[in-house]
């Protein structure tokens, strides 16, 4: 009976095995032979940047690099073993290894000692499922002593640093282990031992190289490191566009603004793996292509000269009394017809890491900082007066001290000019002419020693709307991130409206001033400034330009809602400032050959810079706007020097910078075979003077 039962059981087993082999055999075979296709994106170098004349500004320097690719089946123990082997062959920076990682590593290296850190009572709770693995591990971490952490030194610490890199990415995605200061000896010895270092490879990486050093550096922007990868706040956006977490991306200015252009097309590699995750074959799906190149509107020869001029004039001014708070200056040069920015320069005096006083690049301040700029805006005040009917071209008003009820001191120009017309008011920078214009604009009337009664709310609105047509108090649209619009004053008192009319209330950025004077220079078109001139396909030859993908066209944001003859009249007034009689710019620009026009500016302001103890100290801001040549403007310029000096007199650094920059521009144009800073580019003028001992407002 027993034999029969055993026989039947074996028969059933044989039949079942036969069924599995015959009926399901193919299914099992397919399961065993099942493979998986995994496509990995490998990064490529970023696009380069050139100046308008084809000079390389930002390049990629090749670097020897050591990478690690984790397979799907790679265990923690295997990674640790490979890391230890690699640590014997290379040196690895360990300064960024956090204490927590050292504790984790100590526990991995000393499992028995780590286990002993848990009490018998705690193990009993664990066995009773009242403590879980996570809680036990936390207790172990908390009990690793400082001495045990400090015991991780030398090769062990380098092993940990390498292991951290191994473990930082996803399976089948190469991670940079070392790409800085890889010695030829390290590169060679690792290459020779690759068969003993599973997942490790030697390759070529890149880093950004700036051909002109710190020149324009703040505008060019920065790129994240492969270690930092994509910033957390932008992770979702970039992952949705096929980026990897450790990809290097632009994090400021041009590198950020044109990330989608500069990033390039990644190489795609298909890895075929078996069921266990072992790679069976690798196929290149697409080779990838370096990011597209940017050709900037900037002329780097001019940019270097402008920066040198700013530095020299600032150091010179700092030797004079009253300039303790002077720490920055800005210059913008742009083509008034196309909006191409030829130079965007800013410098700031500060301290380096050793506490030494140095001059730093602050070109970004042209779009991210704003100031009271003084009388440079009087062209907009006059044109707004025409538009509202407060004055007509040729109207005469008496420049005299103005006495208002409740105001002990009279309000006056830097000099009493008597009866003057609009052109003369611009030429000599009359404050009183502007004040009487804005009083009329507000339906008021000047009564000596009487109250100032005007509709301030409506007039502020009218003037700000009008000024915005020139680009004052509104973003210019420049192709850079983080542009600010300036700050409008928050109060509507009548006296503040008078300050507004002479540029001493609302604040404006240097690039807004450049757009404003360009609008006047070109006859009324507010043109959007731009830093990028062209986008080009990359080519492999040494720093040569490829075919044009896109050429940035001039963009007119708006046209002044004003008569052409009004604009021409203000242009004439600006010419008188620079070239006629006692114009406030004549002393500096008399006799120059490039036929400039412009407007000087001085503003009584309150300090709000980095020296906290001097907050709200009275200071003088200096500015200058200009264009040239007068008959056919090629270039527009804005100069802004905040907090230039304290007291009634000080160095006219705005004029010194402006004159030298204008001269440099035209000298550079003459020195070139075809003339001009580049094809079709023109130059810029400058204007704005401070007369010693005179009230601000010139």
Show the residue positions of the predicted features.
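Cysteine/selenocysteine-centered motifs that mediate thiol-based redox chemistry or coordinate metal-sulfur cofactors
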Residues: 5, 9, 92-103, 111-112, ...
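Solvent-exposed, polar/charged alpha-helical surfaces in well-ordered, non-transmembrane soluble domains
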Residues: 77-88, 188, 192, 217, ...
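Short N-terminal helix-loop-first-beta-strand/juxtamembrane motif that initiates sensory/input modules
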Residues: 46-49, 197-201, 316-334
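Solvent-exposed, acidic/flexible segments
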Residues: 42-43, 75-83, 179-187, 209-216, ...
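Beta-lactam-recognizing serine transpeptidase/beta-lactamase-like catalytic domain environment
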Residues: 58-59, 64, 272-287, 298, ...
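Membrane-proximal periplasmic segments of bacterial cell-envelope enzymes
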Residues: 1-260, 268-280, 286, 438, ...
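A conserved hydrophobic secondary-structure block that centers on an alpha-helix together
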Residues: 284-330
